Amino acid sequence: DFTGGIGVLNHGHNHPRILKARIDYQKQKKMEVHKNYFSPYVAVLGQNISQILPDDLNISYFPNSGAEAVEGAIKMAYKYHNGNRKSLLYADISFHGKLLGAASATGSPELSFDFPKIPNTYSFNYNNIDSVKKILNKLKKKNTSDVYAIIIEPFNASSLRNCSAEFLSELRLICSKEDIVLIFDEVYTGWSKTGELFYFMNFDLVPDILTYAKSFGGGKSSI
């Protein structure tokens, strides 16, 4: 993209429709959208997104970056279990961001820059369901899972590897059975980069949480 934000110019460089909408908004002297206060623009945006995603994905949270989206997803999954589960699973081939939680779930050690990780994170082999099952069995306590979330890129942009339909289908079944929050990170692959609006839409399954920030804004503020 010739900028510091890798993969953000999803809508082209200075697309005239986006520029016009931005200029018209400024001419009305409206304040920037502030997420600490109710905004009809944020409400309508969330409603519009819910109409293009599967029914189960009907609540939106709008952060500033892909890493913040992943941080929010991990926190929501942890809070879903009220802190009663302590373990997070991620793929050994992955990049989720450079913030503490996102970097803790990143499989490439050179991208975590030797910072400490959040506790109880475990990696499995990408696109290998037996590896997932092996770790899950180790982490069970009194036949109850200690895993609050599994995060994965269904299509890994860094390696150009993708998960098979069989792997994703069985992963979805396991997470549903064990009440584990399934997080799909499509920050790099979302918004039709793989043909479908999101890569997971090629398959008959839906994650519990989907991350797609960054290129969603087209490199502009307050899209």
Show where each model-derived region lies.
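A glycine- and small-aliphatic-rich helix-loop capping segment at beta-alpha/alpha-beta transitions
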Residues: 18, 76-83, 103-113, 167-170, ...
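A generic structural signal for well-ordered alpha-helical segments
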Residues: 53, 174-175
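A short helix->loop->beta-strand "cap" motif at the edges of active sites that frequently abuts
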Residues: 85, 177-180
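Conserved PLP phosphate-binding loop immediately N-terminal to the Schiff-base lysine helix
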Residues: 151-165, 180-203
